[in-house]
Amino acid sequence: MKGKEEKEGGARLGTGGGGSPDKSPSAQELKEQGNRLFVGRKYPEAAACYGRAITRNPLVAVYYTNRALCYLKMQQPEQALADCRRALELDGQSVKAHFFLGQCQLEMESYDEAIANLQRAYSLAKEQRLNFGDDIPSALRIAKKKRWNSIEERRIHQESELHSYLTRLIAAERERELEECQRNHEGHEDDGHIRAQQACIEAKHDKYMADMDELFSQVDEKRKKRDIPDYLCGKISFELMREPCITPSGITYDRKDIEEHLQRVGHFDPVTRSPLTQEQLIPNLAMKEVIDAFISENGWVEDY
């Protein structure tokens, strides 16, 4: 549980009225005790220590983010979210506060908000040159995939309702036409002619039903393929790569993203941290071929 050193006003209490010194631990000592408990996976006890540190000094953002992580480990996202928001009130540039807040919102299925906070955490980490490895990108990929799955589930439900509605309409129209045919031929003795007309009505509506089922089946088949494999997504933007290039470390990035990283953040590989210059980027032609084939077979990808 690393964090920048905090300045604590009145962390240690002095003597009062000539009495003996207060031996109770300072906020910093409570935080360090919480860190040790966290490493030992004693999350409730660690959270309690951070809570006592907050009581001692409620103006240090890292105490809240540390406790928020404990709450996340204990699967209590609501409590974690409250701590993250308080941490951001104290330090709006806190990477951990945005990161943990995004994780809380992911757990609570607030995918748009989760993605916004995780992207903010990623941007701040780059600006502050903090290395979180693949933790933030991994959480962002999960959030985007879950948001997409949520959209797909909603679409499936809407399509199912539409299919049921159209089925009822076709069935009702079939019954209406059959009843009308029967009324129009009341008193007629030519049953063969009536049966022939009814058969035509049945066949027409059977075809309507079959055509509709085929159309929905085609839509369903296309929908089943709506998933972009992780290996086709850039490790910086997390979107489908358009111009993949490979670094000497063997990592593939989308060219515009890695060039922006080199210009704005520094001349190093964002994953391996190895030194890297723009001249060392080599087009990954094999990956480009795979991506182009994927796009040609999945026109929906532009809306992903």
From Swiss-Prot:
Q: Which GO terms describe its biological process?
A: cellular response to heat; cellular response to hypoxia; cellular response to misfolded protein; chaperone-mediated autophagy; DNA repair; endoplasmic reticulum unfolded protein response; ERAD pathway; MAPK cascade
Output the SUPFAM superfamilies linked to this UniProt entry.
RING/U-box, TPR-like
**Residue(s) of cross-link: Glycyl lysine isopeptide (Lys-Gly) (interchain with G-Cter in ubiquitin):** K2, K23, K222, K256
Q: Which reaction does it catalyse?
A: S-ubiquitinyl-[E2 ubiquitin-conjugating enzyme]-L-cysteine + [acceptor protein]-L-lysine = [E2 ubiquitin-conjugating enzyme]-L-cysteine + N(6)-ubiquitinyl-[acceptor protein]-L-lysine
Tell me the segments the record calls region Required for interaction with MAPK7. Answer: 102-201
Enzyme class comes to transferase
Gly residues bias locations: 11-20
Q: Does the keyword Transferase apply?
A: yes
Annotated spans, Required for interaction with FOXO1: 144-198
Q: Residues where Phosphoserine occurs?
A: S20, S24, S26, S150, S274
Q: In which pathway does it act?
A: Protein modification; protein ubiquitination
The EC number(s) attached to this protein equal: 2.3.2.27
Q: Where would I find the TPR repeats?
A: 27-60, 61-94, 96-128
- Outcome of mutating H261A: Loss of E3 ubiquitin protein ligase activity
Question: What does the UniProt entry say about where the protein is found?
Answer: Cytoplasm; Nucleus; Mitochondrion
Q: Which GO terms describe its cellular component?
A: cytoplasm; cytosol; endoplasmic reticulum; mitochondrion; nuclear inclusion body; nucleoplasm; protein folding chaperone complex; ubiquitin conjugating enzyme complex
**Keywords for this entry?**
Cytoplasm, DNA damage, DNA repair, Isopeptide bond, Mitochondrion, Nucleus, Phosphoprotein, Repeat, TPR repeat, Transferase, Ubl conjugation, Ubl conjugation pathway
| Effect of inactivating the gene | 95% of knockout mice die at birth, surviving mice have decreased longevity. Reduced levels of CHRNA3 ubiquitination in the brain.
* Coiled-coil blocks: none
Region called Required for interaction with and ubiquitination of MYOCD, residue ranges: 143-197
At the top level of its lineage, which domain of life is listed? Eukaryota
Q: In which tissues is it expressed?
A: Expressed in the brain.
Return the annotated region ranges for Disordered: 1-30
The record describes its quaternary structure and partners as: Homodimer. Interacts with BAG2, and with the E2 ubiquitin conjugating enzymes UBE2D1, UBE2D2 and UBE2D3. Detected in a ternary complex containing STUB1, HSPA1A and HSPBP1. Part of a complex composed of STUB1/CHIP, VCP/p97, CHRNA3, and UBXN2A that modulates the ubiquitination and endoplasmic reticulum-associated degradation (ERAD) of CHRNA3. Within the complex UBXN2A acts as a scaffold protein required for the interaction of CHRNA3 with VCP/p97, this interaction also inhibits CHRNA3 ubiquitination by STUB1/CHIP and subsequently ERAD. Interacts with MKKS. Interacts with DNAAF4.
* PANTHER family linked to this entry: E3 UBIQUITIN-PROTEIN LIGASE CHIP
What name goes with this protein? Answer: E3 ubiquitin-protein ligase CHIP
Q: What species is given as this protein's source?
A: Mus musculus (Mouse)
> By which gene is this protein encoded?
Stub1
